[in-house]
């Protein structure tokens, strides 16, 4: 079994385990990851997920040995992934070659990254909401060398994080992007000691899971929706996303604050 799920409280850790291939993705693993994240999104008790690659590598990209067997065959290649609109029209779940990269979840996912997150593995990390990288971890469009394009959101998501110019240079050169540089340019949010990415990602997930979840999801949705919208439309979308959450949770939260909870920025007694 290449994908398994470990649960603690309201946090799911989705583990991709093909260490013999540095967690390179094949079709079976991609499908299993889709199923895992759909189950997570649909579970009312689940709040936050962590994606972690077992064995010291986040993901070395799409398994090129598997891909070589499909060279020149359009039909098998098309069957690896379906665009959002075609899958939706067929009543099927959207899937990319790397698995969940075309899913639009309603809950946050944190990537816990050790070793390489390259080529499609880089795209998989970019699909997540937050990236926690170990000091020796790295990104890179290593597929540049083999004529394999970015088709799992890399050309879409990377510019939104780091800007078009930086993204273009990283994409065109295919060079290695170490963790500290990734954090500096905005492609990663935390750099942590070796061997601790999962621990730190799960700690962050537990913190987020403690908060009122309608509000967490509304704010996350607003951040994602505002990309490319004019300011007025983005502000309107934020309002309509946030209002139901405030009705459901905000008034009760304000009452807890008025009763003395969470004063001076304290998070421990909320």
Regions found by a protein language model. Name each.
Residues 1-9, 70, 174-179, 199, ...:
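C-terminal alpha-helix plus adjacent terminal tail
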Residues 1-56, 68-73:
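Conserved CoA-thioester-binding segment of acyl-CoA-metabolizing enzymes
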Residues 14, 18, 32-33, 51, ...:
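Terminal peptide-recognition signature
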Residues 29-32, 197, 238:
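Hydrophobic alpha-helical membrane-association signature
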Residues 30-34, 38, 64-114, 268:
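An acidic, glycine-rich surface segment that forms the CoA-thioester-binding/catalytic face
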Residues 56-60, 118, 223:
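Short, active-site-adjacent cap segments at secondary-structure transitions
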Residues 100-214:
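Crotonase-fold acyl-CoA enzyme core
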